[in-house]
């Protein structure tokens, strides 16, 4: 009985999720609300991998980084140059 209830709840949740995501606002992001803005952006990043924030490059050891936070060092430590 518990398993049946869990399956029914899961099916209802997935049906509602599909309905929310398939409302057509992907073509009009100006009317997207809430989570839809996030997911439409994620879809665009999947189509254009260069737009993804995960593809940011890091500066190697010894590269100029200026002040901490201006340039991402691969090691994560910056003091004028990227430290090992």
Swiss-Prot record:
Signal peptide: 1-22
Expression tissues: Expressed by the venom duct.
Cleaved propeptide residues: 23-57
CC per GO annotation: extracellular region
Subcellular localization(s) per the UniProt record: Secreted
Protein origin, superkingdom: Eukaryota
Keywords of the record: Cleavage on pair of basic residues, Disulfide bond, Ion channel impairing toxin, Knottin, Neurotoxin, Secreted, Signal, Toxin, Voltage-gated sodium channel impairing toxin
Cystine crosslinks: 58-74, 65-78, 73-82
Pfam families: Conotoxin
Chain coiled-coil ranges: none
Chain segments annotated as transmembrane: none
Family in the record: Belongs to the conotoxin O1 superfamily.
Function, in words: This toxin activates voltage-gated sodium channels. It shifts the voltage-dependence of activation to more hyperpolarized potentials but has only little effect on channel inactivation. It is active on Nav1.3/SCN3A (EC(50)=3.98 nM), Nav1.4/SCN4A (EC(50)=4.99 nM), Nav1.6/SCN8A (EC(50)=1.27 nM) and Nav1.7/SCN9A (EC(50)=2.42 nM) voltage-gated sodium channels. In vivo, it induces nocifensive or pain-like behaviors in mice when injected intraplantarly.
Name assigned to this protein: Delta-conotoxin-like Bt6.4
